[in-house]
Design a protein with these regions (language model features):
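Basic, amphipathic DNA-recognition helix from helix-turn-helix-like DNA-binding domains
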Residues: 1-19
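A generic fold-level signal
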Residues: 12, 18, 41-43, 92, ...
Length: 109
């Protein structure tokens, strides 16, 4: 009888990446790379950046980011998206994510 092993958490396929512009996102490791080595991100930072990377060249509204990352509807008084964007910019560079006034945010390619 084979030995019992603890179930392993489900993860993305080994080596699965998303590339958008200068950014490469490693799905399994939750890291981003802009050509200077991997930068670890929190889960929420990674999910937000992934949402932007899946729409390269297009602005993504705060409402869409809130729904995709946090799972709730847009609250005009919430600054959670702004704070997360600021943290990503501080880790990966301020020029990476463009603020599109009146629309949302865009990953610069």
């Amino acid at each position: 009888m084979p030995p019992l092993t603890a179930p392993q958490p489900a993860t993305a396929a080994h080596g699965e990446v998303i590339k958008a512009g200068h950014v490469t996102l490693d799905i399994a490791r939750l890291v981003a790379d802009i050509g200077q080595g991997p930068v670890p991100l929190t889960r929420l930072e990674f999910l937000l950046l992934r949402e932007l990377a899946e729409h390269p060249g297009h602005s993504v509204s705060k409402g869409r980011l809130l729904a995709a990352v946090w799972g709730y509807d847009f609250d005009p008084g919430s600054n959670v998206v702004d704070v997360c964007i600021r943290r990503i910019r501080s880790k990966l560079g301020f020029e990476l994510i463009k603020t599109v006034r009146g629309e949302g945010y865009q990953l610069v390619s």
